[in-house]
């Protein structure tokens, strides 16, 4: 029988920062980029980590953490295996959500939008920048699929590493970039007494963004 956990008394106050309407630019991508830069400068743990939420066509959700690689041309960009669970769900349902959480800064960004693959050329350019072992690992991992043992994947890795000694490691066709085009972005700043600052940007038909303060 599983052990019960009683966590009712675990809490803390948030009081280090605030967020007001005058702090908000017209384009939420500018604020998102600024917050990510501040997280990097503050040396928070994994400042570019982002939770990616996907769902099957019948609405069964799943989430996982990846590392953001760019905020480019109004899109959030990350890279992964197209045959992974998230890759298969994205192929069937192009609506996704992203959540950035920086505990040290008492901040969160939540993004909703649509997603598509980057071009092969864009994926090739990033893949060539990756460390050698990361490129080899991307080639041999049947991501999200059952494997018999740790030894199985390490043997595949060793064999592929020897195969490409002194040679360029090509990007596998089932690995590449994803670009998320946001339609809603919410910024959350922790405040005293759970009266947090929350602002929601929503993309309008003319391409502009409306801004609303939300109740905490």
Task: List the predicted regions and their residue ranges.
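Binding-site signature for planar aromatic cofactors or substrates
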Residues: 1-216
